[in-house]
Each structure stands twice: as structure tokens, then as C-alpha cells.
Amino acid sequence: TRSRQVTGVQTCALPISHTVDIYYTSMKKYFEYANEVNMDNCRRFIKSLEEEKLSPATIRLRITAIERFSKWLKKPIELKRPKIKRKLDVNNVPTEEEYNRLLEYLKGKNNKDYYFFIKVLGTTGARLSEFQRFTWEDIISGEVTLKGKGNKYRRFFFQKQLQQEAKVYAKEYGKTGIFAVGRFGPITQRGFSQHLKVWGKHCGIDSKKMHAHAFRHFFAKMFLKKNKDVIQLADLLGHGSVDTTRIYSQKSYDEQKKDFNRNVTW
């Protein structure tokens, strides 16, 4: 039964043979562990991979294979993916011009919720997990305090212009409660990432810059551009150490080149 089930992964809609090989190997490993694809077995299998100290990237591949296979079985399963720690690359942060271009694009859509999502991320420096807890009432009131990473309390302020825009929009469309809600319920990291990639393509923005955390980096870079107080920024970002925050003072390749050409005139 196992070999027959594993072969089924090859009939999924996978465009590249290399991808099929990866998925086939992943499912083979799964069926060496369990006889049936169900949520309990899948969770135990993922836990066993973590105990083997496999990299988050490898585990994510295994999860993708299982999800595709479960879809083929017409018993779709969605599993939680381990996070891949992103190393900050100052070249992969949206520029102010790109940020404004994205906002203009989203503002022109029938559903302006996503315009507000980007505006909030770009003006608060919130992590996605914090952003998911904001309410429309928080934004309209101008601030909120949340218990976040490491059981620390963090206060978020909302820009006056954003408050006013949100107040008008919420009244017109009856928006209340949890802020980050899409067509199918609360926004997930995966769903939001997919939206960002599509929007980035429309706006001509590099896909490497189109992930939720990039707007936290954008906020930090913009804040330091206006205010050199790294200690205050560390507090706003909820960093335990100022050393973590100092990385935002680094300049991108384009910024360095521009500064060089402006200053080296002798």
C-alpha cells in the first residue's frame, strides 16, 4: 500500500522533474515513518524531523510534499512550517519610492484593506505576529500595548494620518475588531507572503523585498533617516540589545554609491 501511495505523488501537478524527485523522496521518508496521511501522524513526523536536527528549509520541503500529496488524496492537510531566520540584508529592504508605489497600487484596488495593512507595517515596525493582534480600534485610538516576544510589553504608536484614514474607512465599511483579516479569515504568514509576491510583481519590486518582515526593516531605516536615536528605535522595535538595532544604520549599495558620488568631489 505504501509504494502505491508514494507513486501517487508523481501524478500531482508538478511542473519540474527535479521537484517531483524531491517530493517523491519526502513522501518515501514519510511512509517509512507512518502508514497513513493524517494530521496526528504528520505532526509526529515533523517533530521527528526536528529531533533529527534537520534544517528548517528541509523540513519545509517535507511539509510542502505532504500538503501536495494530501491534496491529491482529496484530504487536504495544512501544517505549521518552521521559521527560517532571515539575515538582514540592507539591499533587500524596500526603498521609500517602492513603498509609496506599492501603497498607491493598493489604494487603487476595490478592497483597500491591504493598503492599510502595508501602511501599518511600514509605520510601526511590527512583527507579523504582533500585527496580527492589532484591532481597528487600536489604530484609530493611536496606540496599543501588547505582550510580545520574550514576554516583554511593547507599546505601538499609530501615525496621525493613518489614524484619520482608518477612522473614515472603518466607519464607511463597518470595520471593527481584528485588523488583519482577509477574505477567508485572519491573515496567515503564508497567505500574506503570496499576496506580497503578486503585488511586488505588479509594482516592479524585487521579490526579495516582498515579505512582511521587510517592512519592519523599512520602518527602522526610515526612522534612522529622520532621527539618529538608535536607543529610541531599539525601544520602538522591541529589541533587547541596541547592537541588534545598529545594523539598520548600514547603507545599501545604492545609498553608498550615491553618498560616494555626492561627497567625493576632489
Q: How should these model regions be labeled?
A:
Residues 121-142:
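Short, charged phosphate-coordinating catalytic segments
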Residues 148-168, 176-198:
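C-terminal catalytic core of Y-nucleophile DNA break-rejoin enzymes
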Residues 10-90:
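N-terminal core-binding DNA-recognition domain of tyrosine recombinases/integrases
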Residues 157-161, 167-169, 250-266:
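DNA/chromatin major-groove-contacting recognition/catalytic segments
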Residues 93, 150, 237, 242-262:
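Catalytic-site neighborhood detector that most strongly recognizes the C-terminal catalytic loop/helix
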Residues 96-128, 152:
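Basic, Lys/Arg- and aromatic-enriched nucleic-acid-binding interface segment
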Residues 1-12:
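Single conserved hydrophobic/aromatic residue that forms the stacking wall/gate
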Residues 119, 123, 216-240, 247:
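C-terminal catalytic core of tyrosine-transesterase DNA break-rejoin enzymes
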